[in-house]
């Protein structure tokens, strides 16, 4: 529990008590002061709740990230073993696929021939 939640609840309670005293005494200034303190306590309590929610969300996200990181090596290993089995089962097909991928990459990475800039003719 966040400190702001505790302090906010205490301020809210004190504001309610002060407002009740103002109601009993018939003092408008004490009533207004109590309502203001109660509102400030409510706001501080809500702020503490928001901080707690953010802290919980960040801890949960960190836990998910740690789990994903821990399992990523196993997933990579499984994928590598599956590819190795496919290559051993069909080496010619794997060679053709690798050659096709290399050819496609070469086409993507090659630059087109540079054309000379267009010449402008001025008619005067």
UniProtKB/Swiss-Prot annotation:
Stored SUPFAM superfamilies = Hypothetical protein YjbJ
**Domain of life of the native organism:** Bacteria
Kindly give the InterPro entries that the UniProt entry links to this protein: CsbD (IPR008462), UPF0337_stress_rsp (IPR050423), YjbJ_sf (IPR036629)
Q: Name one Pfam family in it.
A: CsbD
Q: Which family does it belong to?
A: Belongs to the UPF0337 (CsbD) family.
Protein name stated in the entry: UPF0337 protein blr1496
